[in-house]
Curated annotation (Swiss-Prot):
Xref: InterPro entries: CSD, CSP_DNA-bd, Lin-28_RNA-binding, Lin-28A-like_Znf-CCHC_2, NA-bd_OB-fold, Znf_CCHC, Znf_CCHC_sf
Functional note: Suppressor of microRNA (miRNA) biogenesis, including that of let-7 and possibly of miR107, miR-143 and miR-200c. Binds primary let-7 transcripts (pri-let-7), including pri-let-7g and pri-let-7a-1, and sequester them in the nucleolus, away from the microprocessor complex, hence preventing their processing into mature miRNA. Does not act on pri-miR21. The repression of let-7 expression is required for normal development and contributes to maintain the pluripotent state of embryonic stem cells by preventing let-7-mediated differentiation.
SMART domains associated with the record: CSP, ZnF_C2HC
Name of protein: Protein lin-28 homolog B
Regions of compositional bias (Polar residues) in chain numbering: 173-186
Domain CSD intervals: 27-100
Gene: Lin28b
Key words, A-Z: Metal-binding, Nucleus, Phosphoprotein, Repeat, RNA-binding, RNA-mediated gene silencing, Zinc, Zinc-finger
PROSITE patterns attached to this UniProt entry: CSD_2, ZF_CCHC
Residue ranges, annotated region (Disordered): 1-22, 96-124, 173-247
Length: 247
């Protein structure tokens, strides 16, 4: 019987290397040093280990999966915590983190900013494959379509020969011509034609020929032409002067 009792009291032999392979779990207290809510990890500043205060705080790594709390898991900077940790090749890592007395952690008020997909604003351009407005040709789900005009979507011609595009451009060009014709002539040497309001631009050759004509004329002819020109100007100014007097 004594031998049996002695056999029961003996401790079972431990496997060699088991105690060395298993990391020792320790208990510590401290506060959150910093925590990145977007990446989900941070560090705890441990000020007490196994109930013994530390002269210099020690950093302990903490991951959001080790936090004891509901909802979005995070830590607020300076938040007091209690935790168990172990030694790893990378340093000290927390195993389970709670609030004081085993209560749930409070967590941070910050939330990671989600990646919002910016919707492309419609710019009026079409898909060159199907003509749709909500996508480009590289995003088109249809097989390659026959080539067609990008302006009117017709397969009978290309945009360079599109009659609809040419018809839309003609009114704009004719309007530009009308505006050019309605503007007064701003030439440095205007010539009055038949007493009207139109004018023509004298090119260098015309100026030379006109100067030659004046040189061939006699002084009497030149004076007579000046007199006719003065009479014409008075006739033009006459009605304007009468209208001003009536008003």
């Amino acid at each position: 019987m004594a031998e049996g009792g002695a056999s029961k009291g003996e401790e079972p032999e431990k496997l060699p290397g088991l105690a060395e392979d298993e990391p020792q779990v320790l208990h510590g207290t401290g506060h959150c040093k910093w925590f990145n809510v977007r990446m989900g990890f941070g560090f705890i500043s441990m000020i007490s280990r196994e109930g013994n205060p530390l002269d210099i705080p020690v950093d302990v790594f903490v991951h959001q999966s080790k936090l004891f709390m509901e909802g979005f898991r995070s830590l607020k900077e300076g938040e007091p915590v209690e935790f168990t940790f172990k030694k790893s090749p990378k340093g000290l890592e927390s195993i389970r983190v709670t609030g004081p007395g085993g209560s749930p952690c409070l967590g941070s008020e910050r939330r990671p900013k989600g990646k919002t997909l910016q919707k492309r604003k419609p710019k009026g351009d079409r898909c060159y494959n199907c003509g749709g407005l909500d996508h480009h040709a590289k995003e088109c789900s249809l097989p390659p379509q026959p080539k067609k005009c990008h302006y009117c979507q017709s397969i009978m011609h290309m945009v360079a020969n599109c009659p609809h595009k040419l018809a839309a451009q003609l009114p704009a060009s004719s309007q530009g011509r009308q505006e050019a014709e309605s503007q007064p002539c701003s030439s440095a040497a205007p010539r009055e034609v038949g007493g009207g309001h139109g004018c023509t631009v004298l090119f260098p050759q015309e100026v030379k020929s006109e100067m030659a004509e004046h040189s061939d004329r006699s002084p009497q002819e030149v004076s007579s032409t000046k007199a006719f020109a003065a009479i014409g100007e008075q006739n033009k100014k006459g009605p304007l002067i009468q209208k001003r007097k009536k008003t």
